[in-house]
Amino acid sequence: MTARHSFALALAAAALAPSFALASDDAPAAPPARAAAADKLGQARAQIAARQWSAALDELRRVNDTGSADWNNLMGFVLRKGKTPDLAASEKYYDAALRIDPHHRNTLEYSGELYLMKGDLAKAQARLATLTTECGASCEQTGELKAAIDRYKAAGNKYVSTGW
């Protein structure tokens, strides 16, 4: 491989690195079909990945794309994960996201986790059942919500945060 090819390969890898970082297992990722709409959410996603909840909330409010399931999902996520979680507002945004797209996998997972935070195991299990129907037992969101439910049960029906 020539130095020119090595440089081009390194440049391409560097350009793609932020994309991979933002698509980590813990941060909400945009489905490929929503890539164009997700561009305007990119800054908020970066702030979420950095756990800058207040900045992410400000950015999402600036974008104000209430007709987007992704936007509503991110609003719910930020409000649930912030320093002082607003569970009622988070639920409102998750519900809005699911009205727009009833198959939104991240919203199904995150709203299930919200229900665990609220002590509603039955609703969390219902979200898990929907996810299992949507994408099977092997999809990431199903596994994450199942693990959260297992932690909840193991802790005597108390929510256990993963630090995210």
Question: Model regions: which residues?
Answer:
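TPR alpha-solenoid repeat register
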Residues: 71-73, 107, 141
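Terminal, low-structured helical/coil segments at or just beyond the last alpha-helical repeat
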Residues: 3, 7, 26-35, 125-164
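Alpha-helical segment of the N-proximal tetratricopeptide repeat
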Residues: 35-63
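Structural marker of alpha-solenoid helical repeat scaffolds
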Residues: 63-66, 100, 133-137
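Structural signature of tandem alpha-helical TPR/SEL1-like repeats
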Residues: 50-55, 83-96, 119-127
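Canonical tetratricopeptide repeat
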Residues: 74-75, 79, 110, 144-148
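Residue at a conserved register position within TPR or TPR-like alpha-solenoid repeats
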Residues: 47, 79-80, 115, 153
